[in-house]
């Protein structure tokens, strides 16, 4: 019976449609991650101080970018819904107001980045590193505008099911960033040697290049011209602005809750010892790369479900959600298998010299990677289920669920297992399993409830 369901023509078509959306998105997500990874590698080869300052500055920049992306995710849901309802004028309004709210957000966020040095000093950071990190942000902060506006236009391409454009623009931007880093950090081929400042300039220019490529597609491709995206671009539409804000701010808050959950875990790993913190950094880097798969499926889910909701088709929503959950399960099982079979090989990639310190990091890393294998299933499902709920324009209750799951349940359990029970790093990761598991279960039942209200039965056939 299960095999017949999996091989039914409708399910296969749902797989095909989902993968056509998700694969380019996964590719663009990975390209973006590789961009940050190469920044770290090149700054590390320049100097230890440059690496520390670059990581500190980039952490603030990425945090602000992730937070602001909540509004662009809201635009994905609203624009896809409007496209599904064949309301092209609403797509245009949502993109326009998405740009407005994004630009306003960026201007506000210039303030903490402009005055970042005293903030770093208040956080107890080294004065010399704080000065370098602040210098990084003075140049990187202008890249927040193209980085987030790019995400708004990404919503348009997803609504029209044209994800390859997103992949192409992101990939070209990431490749350019590597080349620009080589020129500007080290001063190769006659360019000035700028160190940390060079990495920031390269990042800003690469974001701008990716945005320009997207704009070129919007202007040159005939299929996009009827939407007249830039017609009356300065006109304000209050109801669309409110819709994006009301749907988007809970997404921003949920993303802050999740990001700070893992940041809090890093602090606890540092309390244990330096080797545990280093091992955690490696394992989280591996998990972050893998998460791009689940994140791509989540974006695909948001887009497809929003579009089906616009067509008022709850049966299609159930078909899509089942297909994505099944693909997600397959992906998670492959990742879990790799983590369980090759923990030493995965950790060793990040360690060069064979010393007592690196062997300690390797030993701890292998242990916590096994725990990471077990939370993959929950991490995968909470990501896509959250995407489904966003597709149904349900963001406030999921935000509350996220805050409770990650902080009240997850961080508390991590602390208890690590320090009261004495499990150290394994205890911190045990909290990940509990927190992410709690979130995925609540998101699942929330989605079933929302689905049943759409008239598709009780949602009991969901995987």
Locate each region found by the language model.
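Short runs within selected transmembrane alpha-helices of multi-pass transporters and secretion channels
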Residues: 72, 140-158, 166-174, 199-215, ...
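Generic alpha-helical transmembrane segments of integral inner-membrane proteins
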Residues: 26, 30, 34, 63, ...
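Small-residue-rich hydrophobic transmembrane alpha-helices
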Residues: 51-110, 114, 147-161, 165-166, ...
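N-terminal transmembrane alpha-helices
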Residues: 9-41, 45-46, 59-74, 78, ...
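Helix-terminus/linker motif at the lipid-water interface of multi-pass membrane proteins
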Residues: 30, 34-52, 120-127, 183-194, ...
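Transmembrane helical elements of multi-pass membrane transporters/channels
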Residues: 20-39, 139, 173, 206-210, ...
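Short alpha-helical transmembrane segments in multi-pass integral membrane proteins
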Residues: 1-22, 79-145, 193-249, 305-374, ...
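Interfacial/gating helices of multi-pass transporter permease domains
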Residues: 20, 43-62, 94, 128-132, ...
């Amino acid at each position: 019976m299960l095999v017949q369901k999996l091989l039914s023509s409708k399910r296969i078509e749902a797989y095909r449609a989902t993968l056509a959306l998700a694969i380019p998105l996964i590719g663009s997500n990975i390209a973006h991650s590789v961009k940050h990874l190469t920044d770290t590698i090149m700054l590390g080869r320049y100097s230890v101080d440059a690496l520390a300052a670059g990581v500190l500055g980039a952490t603030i920049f990425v945090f602000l970018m992730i937070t602001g992306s909540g509004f662009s995710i809201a635009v994905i849901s609203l624009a896809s819904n409007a496209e599904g309802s064949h309301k092209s004028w609403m797509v245009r309004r949502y993109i326009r107001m998405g740009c407005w709210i994004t630009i306003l957000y960026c201007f506000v966020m210039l303030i903490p980045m402009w005055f970042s040095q005293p903030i770093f000093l208040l956080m107890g950071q080294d004065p010399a590193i704080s000065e370098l990190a602040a210098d990084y942000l003075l140049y990187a902060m202008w890249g927040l505008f193209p980085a987030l506006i790019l995400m708004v236009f990404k919503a348009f391409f997803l609504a029209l099911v044209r994800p390859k454009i997103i992949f192409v623009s992101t990939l070209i931007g990431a490749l350019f960033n590597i080349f620009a880093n080589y020129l500007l950090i080290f001063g190769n081929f006659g360019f000035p040697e700028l160190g940390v400042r060079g990495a920031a300039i390269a990042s800003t220019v690469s974001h701008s290049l990716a945005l320009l490529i997207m704009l070129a597609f919007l202007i040159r491709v005939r299929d996009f011209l009827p939407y007249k995206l830039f017609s009356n671009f300065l006109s304000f539409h209050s109801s669309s602005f409110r819709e994006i804000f009301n749907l988007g701010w809970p997404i921003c808050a949920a993303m802050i809750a999740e990001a700070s959950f893992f940041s809090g875990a890093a602090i606890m790993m540092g309390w244990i010892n330096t080797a545990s913190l280093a091992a955690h950094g490696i394992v989280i880097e591996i998990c972050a790369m893998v998460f791009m798969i689940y994140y791509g499926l989540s974006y695909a889910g948001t887009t497809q479900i929003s579009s089906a909701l616009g067509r008022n088709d709850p049966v299609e929503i159930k078909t899509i959600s089942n297909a994505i959950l099944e693909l997600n399960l397959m992906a998670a099982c492959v990742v879990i298998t790799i983590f369980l079979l090759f923990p030493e090989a995965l950790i060793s990639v990040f360690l060069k010299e064979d010393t007592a310190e690196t062997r300690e990091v390797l030993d701890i890393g292998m242990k916590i990677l096994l725990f990471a294998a077990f939370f993959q299933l929950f991490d995968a499902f909470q990501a896509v289920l959250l995407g489904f709920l966003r597709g149904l324009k349900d963001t406030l209750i999921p935000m509350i669920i996220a805050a409770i799951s990650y902080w009240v349940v997850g961080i508390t359990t991590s602390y208890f297992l690590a320090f009261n029970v004495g499990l150290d790093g394994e205890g911190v990761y045990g909290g990940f399993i509990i927190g992410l598991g709690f979130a995925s279960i609540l998101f699942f039942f929330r989605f079933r409830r929302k689905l049943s209200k759409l008239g598709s039965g009780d949602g009991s056939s969901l995987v």
